[in-house]
Amino acid sequence: MLKPRYSVDLIKQMAECDANYIRLLKLVPQLAVYRDMTLSNSVKSDKGSTSTNGHLKRVPHRQIESLVGLKVEFAISEALESKGPITVQIKILENFRYTNTLEIVQKPEIKKLLTNPSMIVRIYHDASSAEVISTQGHKVSQSRYLVKNPKMYSADEKMRVNAFLGEWLTHCLKVGRSIRTPEKLFTI
């Protein structure tokens, strides 16, 4: 009996990418500036500076540019062989009006056991979605690959790497703790 051909479940794939967007906003709250800018551009009032409900304000472009290079790091496990704690680092590589590109890597390198995960993730603020565009240096661009392909990707490679990103970010949210102490705990 022939095995049924893999078909892309677009609803499930988009739901995973949308959930990853929410997880990333929780881990890197500075990204909300881009989301707010996207919302303020789409819901302008007559004045052009606030939305009709008065909550969203136009974000100055110079404030957005300052986030490129921002690194957020979370310890997800205790020290391993005196190399320090295992951490996940999220770095903003580039930004445009409606998108950001992030690099997410796990440190330190543990080459004798396994290859540390690393991903390039594109965030689409206008669609409230985040998807993996590269993992371990390999571009993941197709929603479905042929069963026999030169790079030996699975048929649902894109879905699998986005699901792994979701599990990785969820782990950071559950057990991760920030490496850097916040500058302000609260304002009065």
Question: Where are each of the predicted segments found?
Answer:
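Glycine-rich, often proline-containing surface loops adjacent to acidic residues and nearby aromatics
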Residues: 3, 7, 100-102, 144-147
